[in-house]
UniProtKB/Swiss-Prot annotation:
Listed name of the protein: PCP degradation transcriptional activation protein
GO BP terms: catabolic process
One example GO MF annotation: DNA binding
Function: Transcriptional activator for the pcpA, pcpB and pcpE genes for pentachlorophenol (PCP) degradation. Essential for PCP degradation.
Domain HTH lysR-type: 6-63
Family the UniProt entry places it in: Belongs to the LysR transcriptional regulatory family.
Pfam families in the record: HTH_1, LysR_substrate
DNA-binding region: 23-42
Keyword Ligase: no
Record carries keyword Signal: no
TM spans (from-to): none
Amino acid sequence: MNDSVLPLGHLMVFDALYRHGSAGKAAHALSMPQPTLSRWLAQLRTHFDDPLFVRTRSGMEPTPLAARAAPHIAEMIAIYRQHVRSELRFDPGTSNRNFRIAASDFGQALMLPRLYATLEETAPQVRVTGVNLRHGPLVEELESGSIDIAFGGFPTLSAGIKTQTLFREEYVCVMRQSHPALTHGLDLEAFRQCRHIIVTAHEFNHVHEQVEARLLELLPPESIRFTTENFLVSAVIAEETDVILTIPSRLARWFANRGGLTIFPVPIELPSIEVKQYWHERYDKDPGNIWLRRVIAKIGFQNPPAE
């Protein structure tokens, strides 16, 4: 007998022949061409140095060695089906998996409310943890699986990271409804003279870093009243003070719909953001990761989430 390890498919051929007693029926049960089954049976015979199944008037009868091996082979296949193959499937209706999504505070505010309806309807036990987006360890976290999906606007990430573009985002200005600039208009000179709050690009190499650099280049230093690392905090400050905030348009609409901020076009040209979801190639075929990516891709990002 050969000591080499048999592929699982060969063991399944053995099991099907034992159960059905017919090469034709076994091939049909396995959805494989009969010539392939015959070839694998020949390899099994060579491996065991035994005919294994002998053609008789009543069908393919097992040899004594095959009869002794059959229960053990059936047990191995059952273990595979029960434990291994079940891990290769993902059933959102019964899964209690906790997915970790890395995004900025704005990204989490944009995505998580939209995920809620899908989770309630199709994945009642699935949980989602939103974590802060940090470029430094992001690739390592995606590779290790500690982060399932990242959501944001990175121009480039290292090899091994797969992406899907979700939407393109433009920048606008927001200010509170009693802001003096609303009376006089917001041309470039007025924009430079107003007080500003700037969100810093704490996510290194994020597209927002280019926007921050452009604003710092254009605005007099004394006009920058606040800097923060948080979009939502900055928007709250803009609601309460006479500062102008330059932010992505979807976040601006989110606050404007609540009545606290007024939207104005930016009087300078700024780069837009191509917002994508990111995952590591190690998990490209992971059923749970595939399900989450499909759910995210179907989310309607064009409008604010329902109140």
